[in-house]
Amino acid sequence: MVHFSLAIPATLTEHSLNFVANFSNQPRPLIVKVHDSFLLETKAKAALTRITTQVEGMEFVDGVPANNVSDWARHWSTVYDWRKVEDELNSKFRHFTTTVQAGDNYTYPVPLHFIHHRSPRHDAIPLLFLHGWPGTFHEVGNIVDLLTNPPNTSLPAFHVVAPDLPGFGFSPAPTHAGLGLREMGQSFNSLMMQLNYSRYVGQGGDIGSHILRLMAADFPVSLVSMLSNLFSVSPNATDLERYAKHETSPDETAQISLLKNPDFSWTKAYWDIEASAPLQVSIGLTDSPVGWMAWQYMGMRMLSPGYDWGVDELITWSMLNYIQGPYGGIRSYKEAKREGVLDGNFPYVAQPVGVVQYFGDAAYYTPLEWTQRQGNISFYSRKAPHVVGGHFPAYINPRALAEDCWAFWGNESRSGSGIFLREALLAPAWFPQGSNVRDQ
């Protein structure tokens, strides 16, 4: 029998996370507070950003244009106010920390930061929201009120739990190898059990969706159903053979062509370098806040067509993964590669699965028939190209994704959500129904 210790290792407490936090073995409230010294250092580094000389006419082909980087550096060092953002994060979200187990294959404690917003509705469904790269808990901010307090009682409501993946945001990066996506999923199931949610549903895209698919196999009773906004399915040998013979359907042709498009090589380049040499690439990105901002922005821009990212907005997204350093989040790709996830090796999801696709994301044209090979697909929706959302629909187009959630889980036979009406789930003892933990 494996014995777990939930004591935080000395290596974590000795290493500066650059923010104030206490990770115990039970959920505790957190007030986000980044160290003054780190903020001063970051502004100084932004001011000292060295701008790369670029080749004319290759803007957004070779990378982010130099003038963008120069403008960001100036704005970050002279205008951007993290303390204002911090106040907004503390007033908008109910933050918690805890420590959980991650199963037999990773016996070290897993400290987590998470958001927990309970609905006032007695019939609300517990929902585990998992972000992707390069996101954080922040992705849930624009949709959480729609989920906890839908506009009318005919729509399903949710108790929303949105953790930072380990190494992202305020969830400390693992200090040992072996915390892959499957182990992350086991830690998130432990979190839901700790919150007294014995059954729950899941929503996620990108890495978050990958984790939910692994969780579905590991926890077939607890995870009742899932809604994915990036249900990745690779074409098999037969698909590629038919494509070469021009025998594929329009959807199949579009998705395979997308994967073969030279522009898509940008996305694959991120996977390859982050999965192969995460520490090497992180050395420079950890030292340069603006360099890190440019690194993540190139992918964000390509995967969210039609959305205009503001400078303050981009800096905040960058800061949330720069505070503790980007290495832990980047290294998750190395673990995903080890598990075969980057090659599309997933277990079949027997639970009901909803699939929604937003234009610009990597799996936009994936045919229904392909998704049915890897899951019990009971809901499938592809948005028209003019509908914004891309890789980040919860953040960019929260109403549209909320409507997907309502449509999927509002249908009991399609999603299995009827079980939540038949079971009386008790509110967690440490977080009474309707209470505001910040007042305790």
Residue ranges, per PLM feature:
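The serine-hydrolase catalytic nucleophile loop
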Residues: 133-145
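Short beta-strand element of the alpha/beta-hydrolase
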Residues: 124-132
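Conserved hydrolase catalytic core segment
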Residues: 146-155, 194-255, 414
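Alpha/beta-hydrolase active-site loop
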Residues: 176-194
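C-terminal subdomain of alpha/beta-hydrolase-fold enzymes, centered on the catalytic histidine
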Residues: 274-440
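Fungal secretory targeting signals
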Residues: 1-10, 440
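Non-catalytic accessory segments flanking enzyme active sites
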Residues: 39-118, 326-342
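Glycine-rich "HGGG/HGxG" loop immediately N-terminal to the catalytic nucleophile
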Residues: 84, 153, 161, 165-179, ...
